């Protein structure tokens, strides 16, 4: 995992980052909500605006209960809560993804796209494929929380406690 500009990366807690994640906090602030799951080989790089011939980088906000599957490049300006981004997606500069959204695997979202709440997008380039029910917010929240709990449980099992190691030495 490579976290550049760590002082500019704010995590609310209960977040999981797998191996080979790159977060570019050295460019601009990155704010993560709770239960954000970032899987292998994901690059999170804040976006920029061009004004009067100069480039200004913009902070990135990622909401609660967000899962980003492996091999994605994320350059959005904001990702809402209860969002699932499939494997191999490219999220272009200044994209805004609202709450309760599903992005299918291998989707490419062009720069400056606004993804409305309760929608499914997929394809190259991304296009609207359908609506999600209001239940998706609870489904995505449960999935992210369960993933976190399982991840923490697996980590605890992988690290033997001091009492267990003493007992095995007796």
Residue ranges: model-predicted function:
Residues 67:
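Short HxH-centered metal-ligating active-site micro-motif
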């Amino acid at each position: 995992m490579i976290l550049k500009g760590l002082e500019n990366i704010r995590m609310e807690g209960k977040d999981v980052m797998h191996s080979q994640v790159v977060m570019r906090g050295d460019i601009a602030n990155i704010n993560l909500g709770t239960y954000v799951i970032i899987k292998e080989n994901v690059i999170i790089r804040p976006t920029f605006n061009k004004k009067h011939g100069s480039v200004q980088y913009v902070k990135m906000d990622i909401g609660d209960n967000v899962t980003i599957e492996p091999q994605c490049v994320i350059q959005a300006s904001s990702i809402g809560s209860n969002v699932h981004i499939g494997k191999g997606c490219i999220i272009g500069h200044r994209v805004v993804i609202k709450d309760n959204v599903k992005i299918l695997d291998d989707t490419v979202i062009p720069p400056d796209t606004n993804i409305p709440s309760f929608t499914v997008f997929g394809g190259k380039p991304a296009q609207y494929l359908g609506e999600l029910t209001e239940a998706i917010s609870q489904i995505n929240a449960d999935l992210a929380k369960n993933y976190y709990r399982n991840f923490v449980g697996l980590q605890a099992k992988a690290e033997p406690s001091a009492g267990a190691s003493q007992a095995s030495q007796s």
